Amino acid sequence: FTEMEKSNISTLSNKLFTLSSIKQATRALLGKSSKDTYTAEETALATEFWQLVYLNMPDWQMAIKKEVSTMQLRQEYLHAHGVGLHAIGLLGRTLLCERPDSWREDLVKLKSINWRKTNPEWMRRTMPHGKLSKTTIAIHLTCNALKQALNIPLSPEDSVLEQQVIK
């Protein structure tokens, strides 16, 4: 379900994510730059994190089982796009740093998030002009909404960024 060669996915593709978006989200999760390498421990941690995210994303599981098309997920849901994946990676970074003992349990709350693109929260943060925005600000604002859904206090920087949310 990963597009290995291209940096975007065509409308009719059966792929869910690009390799590039997975790499970006994992770098955000581990706080790494594009030139950094991963230790064996970091690789294991990232693998565990993404496996637990998958277990808490019923739509992704349905796509793997071919109970829903990836095209439909991309049309209707934020979590089926790189911007959503990247925001989940950023959320994971916060969880790993601030909740090292409970982050696994916290991920269960991902199931209760309304990931539909029509959710007004995403319209204001990730889709300010009616289409997905992949800007750094949009990714961070999306992550802020995830933090709020998981009852994670926003940092001072996050709070300042919240002032940019379209009301």
Language model segments and positions:
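Accessory terminal alpha-helical modules
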Residues: 1-167
